[in-house]
Amino acid sequence: MNFEFVADTDARLIRPIVHRDERGCFARTWRAETFSQAGVAFVPKQGNSSLSTLRGTVRGMHFQRPPHSDAKIVRCSRGRIHDVIVDLRPESPTRGRIYAQELTAVSGVMLYIPGGFAHGFQTLVDDTLVEYLMGEFHVADLYDGFRYDDPALPIVWPEPVRAISDRDRGWPDIAPRTPWLADSAPAGAL
């Protein structure tokens, strides 16, 4: 696996080494020693998957508040997604920055997202499957989010939004809950 920093954050793009032959292909997606050697202190505690049947589906923006901020590894195992992260850590030099990356089943590229980031994605094709390894267990009382179209964080979604849950549509704005956001660096993209 090859690890690349995402712009100026401690998030990482992870490019598995893919072995191909007449049967198809094989790639290792997790090995504790490899992650540790790359400086990624991550131990999976939970695995999740989501299947979105419609192109243009948005899921997000989600995060889990301290003390159980959840690092995660995201992989698109079928289809393509526009994956978005926002650094919400108040002391981070990249707080408030938006980063986006296309993840596809064909490339196998994964995204490591440290705790303290919000995460969301939009499907770019029908029948898209996304899998996550989570560094924390889900804690319902600490689960939080903000709207995908929050005016304080101008996230660009490449497709018209065709499907979104009532919960994701109903999240409150982020700015009243993060007073430091107004002083943050301008939004950036990968």
Question: How would you label these PLM feature ranges?
Answer:
Residues 103-126:
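Conserved metal-binding segment of the jelly-roll/cupin
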